[in-house]
Amino acid sequence: MPELPEVEVTRLSFAFEIAGARVISVRIGKPLRWPLGCSPTQLAGRSVQAVRRRGKYLLIDLDQGLLLVHLGMSGSLSFARQLPPAGAHDHFEMTTTLGTLRLTDPRRFGAVVYAKGEDAPEAHKLLGKLGMEPLSDDFDVDRFHDELKRRRAAIKQVLLAGDTVVGVGNIYASEALFMAGIRPTLSAARLSRPRSARLHAAIRDVLARAVATGGSTLRDFSSAKGENGHFQLEAMVYARQGQPCRVCATPIKSLRQGQRSTFYCPHCQKA
């Protein structure tokens, strides 16, 4: 699943080019996770003001309302002046005066949802319960620690839930916990203030480096320009079960948490 870095990389790869474009037409393919919420013809004539991100959602601001885009498990966006003919997995296509934006999603867990502009976007039901943005000033270390002290679940599970800090998916949760020296199964409530601060810094660092390297391409992720990410090449623990830790040479181990694979170093993450 594309996580925060992949969504941010996607945003950066087309936000500037599409700003100011006028929508000519919208084509809908097979049903996605949620319906569009309006007739495609209603979007014709709207102009694109900006493209923002909230967690793993892209927010395409229009002069009237906005489009919420979620890439689901396997989705990706493409944007170009001219794209090849739509294929079997291309389920949303918005043609504009500056190019065509297309959502390709083989598993169809992604979605494009229109939201009217009467209310603040943050109030939308898909966004209202999201946690702090880890790459913004909103991600306050004291608030982060206070939130963790109220959670008895394993720290890895708390990070994945998205209601404390948003967008830290499976890859980057494992990496951040390694950097902070915290065992993934430790109860979040047991983290001291200094350890919460180390995790806070590790989350910001890992996500920033992932964005800078284009995200992680494990299977089919690419930016809206078709470029693959490279963060997976420098991962410290993720998908490295049995390989030596890059710090201490102890073999990396894995375990299952909530039906997701977690990777960690038993020496560097003793507690």
From Swiss-Prot:
Binds 1 zinc ion per subunit. SUPFAM superfamilies: Glucocorticoid receptor-like (DNA-binding domain), N-terminal domain of MutM-like DNA repair proteins, S13-like H2TH domain. PROSITE patterns: FPG_CAT, ZF_FPG_1, ZF_FPG_2. GO terms for molecular function: 8-oxo-7,8-dihydroguanine DNA N-glycosylase activity; class I DNA-(apurinic or apyrimidinic site) endonuclease activity; damaged DNA binding; zinc ion binding. It catalyses: Hydrolysis of DNA containing ring-opened 7-methylguanine residues, releasing 2,6-diamino-4-hydroxy-5-(N-methyl)formamidopyrimidine; 2'-deoxyribonucleotide-(2'-deoxyribose 5'-phosphate)-2'-deoxyribonucleotide-DNA = a 3'-end 2'-deoxyribonucleotide-(2,3-dehydro-2,3-deoxyribose 5'-phosphate)-DNA + a 5'-end 5'-phospho-2'-deoxyribonucleoside-DNA + H(+). Its EC number is 3.2.2.23, 4.2.99.18. InterPro entries: DNA_glyclase/AP_lyase_DNA-bd, DNA_glyclase_Znf_dom_DNA_BS, Formamido-pyr_DNA_Glyclase, FPG_cat, MutM-like_N-ter, Ribosomal_uS13-like_H2TH, Znf_DNA_glyclase/AP_lyase, Znf_FPG/IleRS. The active site is at 2 (schiff-base intermediate with dna), 3 (proton donor), 56 (proton donor), 260 (proton donor). GO terms for biological process: base-excision repair. Its cofactor is Zn(2+). Gene3D superfamilies: 1.10.8.50, MutM-like, N-terminal. It holds the Pfam family H2TH. A zinc finger (FPG-type) spans 236-270. Keywords: DNA damage, DNA repair, DNA-binding, Glycosidase, Hydrolase, Lyase, Metal-binding, Multifunctional enzyme, Zinc, Zinc-finger. DNA binds at residues 89, 107, 151. Involved in base excision repair of DNA damaged by oxidation or by mutagenic agents. Acts as a DNA glycosylase that recognizes and removes damaged bases. Has a preference for oxidized purines, such as 7,8-dihydro-8-oxoguanine (8-oxoG). Has AP (apurinic/apyrimidinic) lyase activity and introduces nicks in the DNA strand. Cleaves the DNA backbone by beta-delta elimination to generate a single-strand break at the site of the removed base with both 3'- and 5'-phosphates. HAMAP family: Fapy_DNA_glycosyl (MF_00103). Monomer. NCBIfam families: fpg (TIGR00577), PRK01103.1 (NF002211). Belongs to the FPG family. This is Formamidopyrimidine-DNA glycosylase. The lineage of its organism: Bacteria, Pseudomonadati, Pseudomonadota, Betaproteobacteria, Burkholderiales. The gene is mutM.
